């Protein structure tokens, strides 16, 4: 005890009795401060241990009372060396903190004082209702409590506030109930007041009519509701009473409270905004009155707008609601006079359009349009769905796309001549203009430098007055002001002088097509000769000379080559800089390629892939007939596979090659006809338009963004452009089609596209900012909704009625009539051809059957094979079976087992030829010596593995046992004609080889990965909406955010590939008969091409093999390699293995040691928390019961709320509940139902259709079931099921799981080695090697984080690993440290009873580095850390980590030893 502290204790009269004084005397005063003016003292005390609560309160009371008696104040803070404390002490200190809070912050105290508190292990958890969390009041509470506890020495206590969902629900219900009771009370008081007024008033004379009854009052209320003024939702931003809205319900959720009341939460939009609404309903009877509250309905609602304390947003509490009719937009033109839309995008246009193809076609059909075209950007992924939908809707679908057309080779030199590059004279020029259109904009500066052999010999620089003030945009971009151009020479004079300046020279410009185009347009306008001398485009020169550069603009090039460019976008500076670059290029092209002549630049420098840098122009391509469909498929494939560069491109020569059967339209403002017209005028546009079959014109509103971009002056100019486009078509006698460039259906949907497009960021061309700095904004998006005929005619009314009708209706109908109906998706299955496939399958089947069951075969086997082969061979499925057998056999030969998935195990033929290990026959005995067999067909056993052991009645050999009792019908349907879906689980290590096997068997040109289309997910859509809200200064209430996110979700974002699916095209056809192809995610370096269509769209037409990678076969292979035990020799009924499912004794541990009451941790199929819980509830003892569990765990609404309740209530057992789909058919047939009906019932139940079929059909099934004594609980259970797992799939999984479990029981060190090498996802070596206490402590730490929802994904994975680590340690095995010379790269190493971890188990050390490290140590010992970093490929951080763990021992930093070290 310090002297100062001893003196303090004496002054406050601290009693020196033994217990308290002995505890506190270890203290000392670290510091003390005195604030004289406030008479306030502040102490910092230090104690070795935390004071007991009794000693602390005694000290605290004496300290405060002593200073109070002196008229002074005191406060303090305590520091403690050892801050550990037990639960009771922490509870006491927490109570003290609450008391302090009560006196200082009563409002916070009152909220938290009566809440549930959980205290343990230096952590305090408080459960609070949701509104406290939403108001962030818990953060203030945590801070205050933590401050108090820290001051008394408890600085390490973790405090968290979690939501008490039960309390939240009860409070919300109480809140609503209280509101209702208050309302009723107020109404009662009003009635009483009214009654007293009436009683005190004189009696009125008799009236002719009696007072209104309740029904009349209600009628008046309804009438007032019907006539009430409708308020737009956007106008309501605060609490209000009796507001009336009308809108569309887009989301509904209802739930029942504990008291039986029902709350209906729904969301409504009127497309100005959206509101969350709720209606409380007393019971299910009253709920019927509110049947109109369902998604998709339009309603009128009246209610109070209140700030909901639980959602923290404005919510309408609905008082009145009624369904209203809503009339969607209609096409009012008479039948036969309706347009055809020829330019429409669906949500398959990547991040650009909203409607599904079904919505587009439905709208066109509803309007009575005879046809509608699909023209997505550069893809045809909506074709299959569009094809099926159009057939269903009775409308012609026109299949097309908006392609990216590029020139094959873009020249460097125009008007080329035979000139030596080093000897020529060049005029390097640049122009500045008021816009990008040579027709609609004007020249304001021409500047040039005449250069010879790198030197400037003369310059030209003239401004030109356009005759009107320059726009702010022009001045901002070019730096040219009205003062520059005012009083300048006339344009014609400048043009003449410039022509004279250029005589005898080669012209040079950067992006010469623009500058030359502008000059020629002005020359023509003033009857001057156009440019005829050679022109070098330095942009294309740079692209071909430096293809490795990503950017070839003037700015980036001058920076790269150190050329000055002081005022970019002023012509004189740009021209001089371009000239300097030209002579650098001339020098480099000679040194790199030996080129000296102007003509050589085009013939020898322009590369074959110059299309990659060529400017993309849009063109619309349409399928005219079946030949055209295949050619479109080829074009899409080539554009994605051979010509992809940023986007899928189609070179003009490629389009020419495959143009048969295709109609080509001129597309939108990004098409070359429109661009040429805008830039060069009608004559040039006519030349370009010759390539196209028709010319598109679009509503002026579609072109309106060009005004914002300063490409067009005003709406009048847009109308003139449309007239000019029609003139172009008329000169060529080509039809003009008015198209809408549709990107969404209704005008109010524009916001969805706005959000999607802006989510692309400013890097996207469509979002390029106009203006600079704070004025920079992207151009507005056009009004691109689907227009009716009337709306379209109105858009073109300025052309006159007849011309408008011609381009809107007559021409579009005529063009649609030229297009034939095509078959996009074929009707039949086309399997590849393998020679003698049918014979091979039959021969292999019978050969194996004879080997196992003898010849002649037992009748039950013979009939089953005959039945299956009849279906398999008769429907052309033999090749599917044979291909699967070949793949499995090849993997087996490489040493891997292959697990089957799905229902293939229902086929006995599949079993016989080696596709699956699952035997679907009824449970049976089979003699391995004499082939005698006994079948159990009465349903008494669910699996042959559960039969009691028995010796052969013929020869005395112990029988083998097999058979899972699975009908063949569950695989290929009752009539055996369903396309077989054979899914196989290959080892993840062997999967790549299995994929290559498919190519080897069928040919590379016939095997493709199954393609997928990735769309905007719900959470991503929500993020897009919030991002738009942030970036564009919007504010949306929560319901509106939800509505917008729903509108945005589903838009195509990318493409990908199925993890294991491979599509096989028949070798007598080609892939373009079915689908285009591409690379996944546009990765042209990928090893495999994929189907362009989502594979589900063609899975009934071509063979799809699911060759999936799975851990189970890899694990089995690892265990076989470690033990030498053949996994096929492991019995499925090992009694010790079965004990894992009922306890832990077989592992030699107690439940308390491993934290679970069974031994299934880490066992495939049974090791998850969910299934472990099922195992603990049911304690399965047979293989059949394990199959049940597998089915129950994989199904939907099969266990929870169904079988689980039946078992708990003693109504059924694990054996008798419905587990797998096949069990239904087998059970019902054993009960006496007709097999066909049993099969149909199974199909209805497994797909969740039981309650969706007609009542008449369902009652027929129920009657048949009851007549055959099927219990009611079974029938009711059928009605709850949404999805069921195939028994064959369950059997395959359980067989694999039991093999793994065998090693866990009998060869544990092998099991743990395999588990950690293959299945574990996260490691923490420091913890794993520190022993049981450290492992258990870390697990508790993660558990606490989970309770607070603070655990990371990595920690959750680590917890799973640590569960197995804990079990392994409890069983007496240990983890060693990483060893620089023993550890493997990726797999654990067994050393006695110890596992040595691999290098990848170290955080931050990846597989490639681990392999490099192992390879490096083979070359020799690491003599220093420096050498370890260099040869081993380790970062400094990893070397430091290894050193900290003691793995490097005394390894020096470097190995530059002194000369004398070798003597010691």
UniProtKB/Swiss-Prot annotation:
Any one GO cellular component localisation term in the record: cytoplasm
Q: Which UniProt keywords apply?
A: Cytoplasm, DNA replication, DNA-directed DNA polymerase, Exonuclease, Hydrolase, Nuclease, Nucleotidyltransferase, Transferase
Can you name one GO molecular function term for this protein?
DNA binding
Reactions accelerated catalytically: DNA(n) + a 2'-deoxyribonucleoside 5'-triphosphate = DNA(n+1) + diphosphate
Record carries keyword Transport: no
Tell me the InterPro entries matching this sequence.
DNA_pol3_alpha_NTPase_dom, DNA_pol3_finger, DNA_PolC-like_N_II, DNA_PolC-type_N_I, DnaE2/DnaE/PolC, DNAPol_HHH, DnaQ, Exonuclease_RNaseT/DNA_pol3
Q: List the Pfam families hit by this protein, alphabetically.
A: DNA_pol3_a_NI, DNA_pol3_a_NII, DNA_pol3_alpha, DNA_pol3_finger, HHH_6, PHP, RNase_T
SMART domains for this protein = EXOIII, POLIIIAc
User: Does this UniProt record's set of keywords contain S-adenosyl-L-methionine?
Assistant: no
- UniProt domain Exonuclease: residue ranges: 426-582
Query: Into which family does the record put it?
Result: Belongs to the DNA polymerase type-C family. PolC subfamily.
Known PANTHER family for this protein? DNA POLYMERASE III POLC-TYPE, DNA POLYMERASE III SUBUNIT ALPHA
Q: Which HAMAP family did the record assign?
A: DNApol_PolC
Q: What does this protein do?
A: Required for replicative DNA synthesis. This DNA polymerase also exhibits 3' to 5' exonuclease activity.
Under NCBIfam families, the record lists: dnaq, polC_Gram_pos, PRK00448.1
Query: What name appears for this protein in its UniProt entry?
Result: DNA polymerase III PolC-type
Q: Where does this protein come from, organism-wise?
A: Streptococcus thermophilus (strain CNRZ 1066)
| Name of encoding gene | polC
């Amino acid at each position: 005890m310090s002297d100062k502290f001893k003196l303090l204790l004496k002054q406050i009269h601290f009693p020196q009795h033994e217990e308290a004084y002995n505890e506190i005397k270890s203290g000392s005063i670290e510091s003390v401060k005195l604030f004289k003016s406030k008479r306030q003292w502040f102490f910092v005390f230090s104690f070795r241990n935390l004071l007991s609560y009794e000693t602390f309160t005694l000290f605290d009371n004496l300290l405060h009372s002593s200073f109070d008696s002196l008229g002074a104040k005191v406060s303090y803070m305590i520091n403690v060396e050892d801050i550990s404390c037990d639960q009771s002490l922490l509870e006491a200190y927490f109570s003290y903190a609450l008391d302090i809070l009560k006196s200082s912050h009563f409002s916070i105290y009152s909220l938290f004082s009566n809440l549930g508190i959980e205290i343990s292990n230096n952590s305090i958890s408080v459960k609070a209702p949701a509104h406290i969390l939403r108001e962030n009041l818990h953060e203030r509470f945590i801070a205050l409590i933590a401050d108090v506890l820290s001051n008394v020495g408890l600085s390490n206590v973790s405090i968290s506030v979690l939501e008490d969902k039960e309390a939240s629900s009860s409070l919300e219900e109480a809140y609503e109930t209280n509101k209702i009771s208050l309302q009723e009370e107020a109404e009662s008081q009003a009635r009483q007041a009214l009654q007293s007024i009436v009683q005190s008033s004189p009696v009125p004379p008799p009236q002719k009519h009696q007072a209104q009854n309740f029904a009349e009052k209600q009628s008046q209320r309804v009438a007032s509701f019907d006539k009430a003024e409708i308020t737009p939702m956007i106008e309501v931003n605060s609490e209000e009473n009796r507001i009336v809205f009308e809108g569309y319900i887009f989301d509904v959720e209802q739930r029942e409270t504990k008291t039986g009341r029902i709350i209906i939460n729904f969301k409504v939009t009127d497309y100005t905004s959206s509101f969350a609404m709720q209606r409380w309903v007393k019971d299910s009877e009253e709920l019927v009155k509110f049947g109109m509250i369902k998604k998709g309905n339009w309603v009128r609602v009246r209610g109070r707008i209140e700030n909901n304390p639980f959602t923290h947003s404005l919510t309408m509490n609905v008082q009145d609601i009624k369904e209203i009719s809503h009339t969607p937009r209609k096409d009012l033109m008479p039948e036969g006079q309706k347009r055809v839309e020829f330019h429409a995008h669906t949500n398959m246009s990547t991040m650009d359009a909203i409607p599904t193809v079904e919505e587009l076609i439905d709208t066109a059909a509803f309007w009575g349009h005879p046809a509608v075209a699909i023209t997505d950007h550069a893809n045809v992924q909506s074709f299959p769905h569009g094809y099926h939908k159009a057939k269903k809707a009775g409308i012609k679908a026109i299949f097309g796309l908006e392609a990216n057309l590029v020139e094959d080779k873009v020249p460097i030199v125009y008007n080329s001549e035979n000139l030596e590059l080093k000897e020529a004279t060049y005029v390097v020029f640049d122009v500045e203009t008021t816009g990008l259109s040579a027709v609609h904009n004007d020249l304001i500066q021409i500047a040039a430098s005449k250069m010879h052999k790198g030197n400037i010999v003369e310059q030209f620089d003239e401004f030109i007055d356009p005759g009107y003030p320059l726009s702010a945009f022009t001045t901002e971009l070019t730096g040219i002001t009205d003062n520059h151009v005012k009083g300048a020479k006339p344009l014609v004079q400048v043009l003449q002088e410039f022509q004279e300046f250029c005589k005898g020279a080669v012209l040079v410009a950067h992006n010469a097509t623009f500058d030359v185009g502008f000059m020629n347009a002005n020359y023509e306008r003033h009857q001057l000769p156009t440019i005829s001398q050679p022109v070098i485009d330095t942009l294309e020169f740079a692209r071909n000379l430096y293809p490795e550069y990503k950017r070839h603009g003037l700015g980036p090039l001058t920076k790269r080559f150190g050329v000055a460019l002081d005022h970019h976008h002023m012509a004189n500076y740009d021209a001089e800089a371009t000239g300097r670059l030209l002579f650098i290029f001339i020098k480099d092209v000679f040194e790199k390629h030996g080129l000296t002549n102007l003509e050589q630049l085009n013939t020898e420098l322009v590369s074959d892939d110059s299309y990659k840098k060529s400017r993309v122009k849009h063109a619309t391509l349409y399928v005219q007939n079946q030949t055209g469909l295949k050619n479109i498929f080829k074009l899409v494939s080539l554009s994605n596979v051979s010509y992809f560069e940023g986007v899928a491109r189609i070179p003009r020569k490629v389009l020419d090659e495959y143009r048969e059967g295709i109609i080509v339209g001129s597309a939108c403002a990004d098409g070359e006809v429109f661009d040429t017209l805008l830039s060069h005028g009608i004559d040039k546009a006519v030349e370009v338009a010759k390539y196209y079959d028709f010319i598109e014109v679009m509503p002026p509103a579609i072109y309106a963004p060009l005004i914002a971009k300063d490409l067009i002056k005003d709406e009048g100019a847009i109308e003139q452009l449309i007239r000019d486009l029609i003139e172009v078509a008329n000169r060529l006698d080509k039809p003009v089609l008015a198209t809408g460039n549709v990107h969404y259906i209704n005008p109010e949907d524009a916001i969805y596209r706005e959000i999607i497009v802006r989510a692309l960021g400013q890097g996207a061309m469509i979002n390029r900012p106009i203006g600079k700095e704070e004025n920079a904004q992207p151009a507005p998006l056009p009004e691109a909704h689907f227009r009716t005929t009337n709306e379209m005619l109105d858009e073109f009314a300025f052309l006159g009625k007849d011309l408008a009708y011609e381009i809107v209706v007559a021409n579009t109908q005529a063009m649609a009539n030229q297009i034939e109906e095509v078959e996009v998706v074929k009707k039949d299955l086309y399997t590849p051809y393998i020679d003698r496939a049918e014979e091979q399958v039959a021969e292999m089947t019978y050969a194996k059957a004879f080997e196992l069951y003898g010849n002649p075969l037992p009748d039950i086997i013979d009939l089953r094979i005959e039945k299956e082969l009849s279906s398999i061979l008769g429907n052309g499925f033999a090749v599917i079976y044979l291909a699967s057998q070949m793949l499995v056999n090849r993997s087996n030969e490489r040493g891997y087992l292959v697990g089957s998935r799905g229902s293939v195990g229902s086929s006995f033929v599949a079993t016989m030829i080696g596709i699956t290990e699952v035997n679907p026959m009824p449970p049976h005995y089979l003699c391995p010596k004499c082939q005698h067999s006994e079948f159990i067909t009465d349903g008494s056993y669910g699996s042959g593995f559960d039969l009691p052991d028995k010796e052969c009645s013929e020869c005395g050999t112990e029988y083998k046992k097999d058979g899972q009792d699975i009908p063949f019908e569950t695989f290929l349907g009752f009539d055996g004609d369903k396309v077989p879906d054979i899914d196989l689980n290959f080892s993840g290590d062997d999967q790549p080889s299995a994929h290559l096997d498919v190519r080897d068997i069928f040919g590379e040109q016939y095997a493709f990965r199954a393609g997928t289309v990735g769309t905007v997910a719900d959470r991503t859509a929500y993020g897009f909406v919030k991002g738009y809200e942030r970036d564009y200064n919007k504010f949306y209430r929560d319901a509106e955010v939800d509505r917008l996110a729903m509108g945005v979700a589903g838009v195509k974002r990318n493409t990908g590939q199925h993890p294991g699916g491979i599509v096989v095209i028949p070798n007598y056809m080609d892939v373009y008969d079915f689908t285009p192809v591409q690379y996944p995610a546009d990765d042209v370096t990928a090893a495999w091409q994929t189907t362009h269509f989502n594979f589900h769209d063609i899975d009934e037409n071509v063979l799809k093999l699911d060759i999936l990678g799975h851990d189970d076969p890899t694990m089995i292979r690892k265990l076989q390699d470690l033990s030498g035990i053949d996994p096929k020799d492991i019995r499925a009924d090992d009694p010790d293995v079965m004990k894992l499912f009922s306890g832990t004794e077989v592992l030699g541990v107690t439940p308390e040691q491993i934290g679970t009451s069974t031994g299934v941790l880490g066992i495939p199929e049974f090791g998850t928390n969910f299934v472990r819980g099922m195992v603990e509830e049911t304690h399965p003892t047979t293989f059949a019961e394990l199959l049940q569990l597998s089915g129950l765990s994989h199904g939907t609404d099969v266990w929870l709320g169904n079988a689980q309740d039946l078992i708990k209530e003693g109504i059924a057992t694990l054996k008798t509940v419905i587990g797998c789909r096949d069990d239904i058919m087998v059970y019902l047939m054993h009960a006496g139902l007709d097999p066909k009906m049993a099969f149909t019932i199974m199909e209805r139940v497994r797909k969740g259709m039981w309650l969706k079929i007609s009542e008449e059909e369902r009652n027929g099934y129920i009657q048949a079931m009851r007549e055959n004594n099927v219990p009611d609980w079974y029938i009711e259970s059928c009605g709850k099921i949404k999805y069921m797992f195939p028994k064959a799939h369950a059997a395959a999984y359980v067989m694999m799981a039991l093999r793994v479990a065998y090693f866990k029981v009998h060869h544990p060190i092998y099991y743990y080695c395999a588990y950690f090498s293959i299945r574990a996802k996260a490691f923490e070596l420091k913890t794993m090697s520190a022993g049981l206490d450290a492992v258990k402590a870390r697990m508790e730490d993660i558990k606490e984080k989970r309770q607070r929802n603070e655990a990371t994904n990595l920690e959750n994975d680590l917890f799973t690993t640590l569960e197995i680590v804990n079990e392994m340690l409890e069983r007496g095995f240990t983890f060693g440290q990483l060893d620089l010379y023993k550890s493997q790269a990726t797999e654990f190493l067994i050393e006695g009873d110890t596992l040595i971890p691999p290098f990848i188990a170290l955080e931050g050390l990846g597989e490639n580095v681990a392999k490099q490290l192992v390879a490096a140590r083979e070359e020799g010992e690491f003599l220093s850390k420096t050498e370890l970093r260099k040869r081993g490929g380790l970062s400094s951080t990893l070397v430091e980590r290894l050193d900290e763990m003691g793995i490097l021992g005394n390894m020096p930093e470097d190995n530059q030893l002194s000369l004398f070290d070798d003597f010691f």
